Amino acid sequence: HHDGFCLWPSTKSTHTVAKSPWKDGKGDVVRELSDACREAGLKFGVYLSPWDRNHKDYGKPEYIAYYRSQLRELLTQYGPIQEVWFDGANGEGPNGKRQVYDWPRVFGLVRRLQPGAVMFSDAGPDVRWIGNETGSAGDPNWSTVDPAAVPYPGAEGERVTAMLQHGD
C-alpha cells in the first residue's frame, strides 16, 4: 500500500487509474466506494499513504507539497468524509529515505477541508493506533496519549511503544 498508485484519477500523478486500461482510463474506485457508502447509509473514510515508493521526490522537501495536494483532492472531491486514516510510514528499509511530513499542516488541512472528519494514526490527533499489528491492547490501556510523547505519526522510542500499548 505504499506504491503510490492512486485509485482515483489524480491530476497530481500519472500513476493512477486514469492511466490504466481499467474502464478505459475513466474509472474512479474512490468515487464508486464513496457513492456506494452513501447509498447504503454508511459513512465514508479515506487512507492516503504518506510513503510513496513511486514518486521521484520522496525524501525531499518538494514531496510534502505533492502529498498535501493529493490529500486535498481526496478531501474535496468525494463529499463528506468521516475518517482520514494515516500511518507513520517513513521509508523503512535499507534503501528507504526518511521523510519529514509536517504533520501539523497535514492535520490542519483535514480540519479546514473536512471539519467533521476524525483522524486516525499512532499519534491521533483524534483516534489512535492500539500500538501493534495484532490489534491486542495492553492491560491496562487508557484511551489517552500524551501529544508531547507521540507528537507525530511514526514517532519512535520505548516511551512511544509503552504509551501506545497502555495509554499515559
PLM-predicted stretches and their roles:
Residues H1-D168:
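Mature catalytic domains of secreted/periplasmic carbohydrate-active enzymes
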